[in-house]
Amino acid sequence: MWGGRFDEGIDARMARFNNSFPFDQRMWREDIRGSMAWARQLAQAGVISTEERDTLLTGLETVFAEFANDRFEARPTDEDIHTAIERRLGELVGAVAGKLHTGRSRNDQVATDVRLWTMGAIQRIDDGVRALQQALLTQAEAAGDALMPGYTHLQRAQPVLLAHWLLSHFWSAQRDRERLTDCAKRTSVLPLGSGAIAGTPLAIDRAALAADLGMAAISPNSIDAVSDRDFVAEFLFCAALIGIHLSRLAEDMIIYSSAEFGFVVLADAYSTGSSLMPQKKNPDSFELLRGKAGRLTGDLVTVLTVLKGIPSAYDKDLQEDKEPLFDAADTLELALPVAAGAVATARFRHDRMRAALDDAMLATDAADYLVARGVPFREAHHVVGRLVREAEQRGVALSALPLDILLAAHPACGSDILQVFDMDRSAAQRRVPGATAPGSVREQIIRARQCLGEH
């Protein structure tokens, strides 16, 4: 393909080092699609005849079928997926195969392949995130008005609806999908026609070429088109953040499924046992989901580091973009169905959650009670803090303090202060949009259904 100016063959060690076919062969669909579109444009531009175009297309269809049916036979000399397909095409149709690469460089060819592959990966991962959202929403709808402790710093904070907590993970997943949508816009840009660096001299209709390949736009600059993989980095950032969100959900589920909490029981199908301890039921599904976040972050850092040091235009360093790209997509395509399944089959223990609520979580409500009677919040905060300390010293719940102690805490306190020690009342008071009151949560559920295209 490129050996004409060389007097010696490539060293076997260098050939192995240079060879990307073992991993980039998975882009065979995209490479053949791009080559078929390019053949049509070569004929449209008068560079090849319609007969030659049809011969090339027929040959490429045969190569496609060989890959699709796992019958493609690679050769040791196949440097990458592009050379492998071109070599096989030559075996099938003869010398006319040599015309396919007219006006095209592997630089714009591979950039196109990677963009097409990434577009497909974005759609598959979006489907996976949506399935997780559906599982979260279904559980939220089933939870009704069940209360659970809300935690900050992993300390009991305020009562919230179980559905409210479930939906918190729904909305982070929704932003993940929005980021994927944005990433798709910048990925769906056609580099083909950019050549090696300066653009093709042929009268190629790049807009028609983009439409043929299902891409939304054409690249405005040939140097940028062949050299930048910012769309890969952006995709990997989206993937890494999805991993982080999966990790946070997993951490919650791991904690809540422990015997110390007992808020959730994981299905056997998403748990494992111990080789030694017969009683163990381990949340391995969520532990693995938590662990994958580090891998996804590593894929992002790999590509950012590759991109950092290279000058303008194409450099061989860019071959290193594919393995982290493929790894991140593979990881999420494996992880997301597990996450959705583990959430969908989990059984939430409303009784255990209710039992974990304690009066100290209503301290803010007591402060709000004083604020409603004209006490500045900072003063009210201090007053209730003293009451909490008094309850701790007596070893009783906040609501179990003698009424005279409560009344003596501040002149604004009346006997009706006892009304604040009601968990359901506490949640119901938080009625602003996005809050945990049952009505507000029902509004969230309606919005969530709309996000999923439901009514």
From Swiss-Prot:
PROSITE patterns: FUMARATE_LYASES (PS00163). GO terms for cellular component: cytosol. Pathway: Amino-acid biosynthesis; L-arginine biosynthesis; L-arginine from L-ornithine and carbamoyl phosphate: step 3/3. Keywords: Amino-acid biosynthesis, Arginine biosynthesis, Cytoplasm, Lyase. It is found in: Cytoplasm. Its EC number is 4.3.2.1. CDD domains: Argininosuccinate_lyase (cd01359). GO terms for molecular function: argininosuccinate lyase activity. It catalyses: 2-(N(omega)-L-arginino)succinate = fumarate + L-arginine. Belongs to the lyase 1 family. Argininosuccinate lyase subfamily. This is Argininosuccinate lyase. It comes from Roseiflexus castenholzii (strain DSM 13941 / HLO8).
